[in-house]
């Protein structure tokens, strides 16, 4: 899948799940299951419930995503 095929949306972390997975509530009201991208994991950036994040969604499965940025 090409990098420019992804859909980027903003949301808020609602719940922390095992294995670095998170339930993220998007601004449009939907809830997606998201995992942490490699760069965030590599730099030990902590993500807690209530944090505002950017999520990349695949156009093929809009229920799963990847957290690519945590706002300060």
Swiss-Prot record:
Function: One of the essential components for the initiation of protein synthesis. Stabilizes the binding of IF-2 and IF-3 on the 30S subunit to which N-formylmethionyl-tRNA(fMet) subsequently binds. Helps modulate mRNA selection, yielding the 30S pre-initiation complex (PIC). Upon addition of the 50S ribosomal subunit IF-1, IF-2 and IF-3 are released leaving the mature 70S translation initiation complex.
Cellular-component GO terms for this entry: cytosol
Subunit architecture: Component of the 30S ribosomal translation pre-initiation complex which assembles on the 30S ribosome in the order IF-2 and IF-3, IF-1 and N-formylmethionyl-tRNA(fMet); mRNA recruitment can occur at any time during PIC assembly.
Gene3D superfamilies linked: Nucleic acid-binding proteins (2.40.50.140)
Positions carrying Phosphotyrosine: 60
Source organism of the structure: Bacillus pumilus (strain SAFR-032)
Upper taxonomic lineage: Bacteria, Bacillati, Bacillota, Bacilli, Bacillales
GO molecular function: ribosome binding; rRNA binding; translation initiation factor activity
Domain of life: Bacteria
The protein's name in its UniProt record: Translation initiation factor IF-1
Keywords per UniProt: Cytoplasm, Initiation factor, Phosphoprotein, Protein biosynthesis, RNA-binding, rRNA-binding
Positions of the S1-like domain: 1-72
């Amino acid at each position: 899948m090409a990098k420019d095929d992804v859909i980027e949306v903003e949301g808020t972390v609602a719940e922390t799940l095992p294995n670095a997975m998170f339930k993220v509530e998007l601004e449009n009201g939907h809830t997606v299951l998201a995992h942490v991208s490699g760069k965030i994991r590599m730099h030990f950036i902590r993500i807690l419930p209530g944090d505002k994040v950017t999520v990349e969604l695949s156009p093929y499965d809009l229920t799963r995503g990847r957290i690519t940025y945590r706002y300060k």
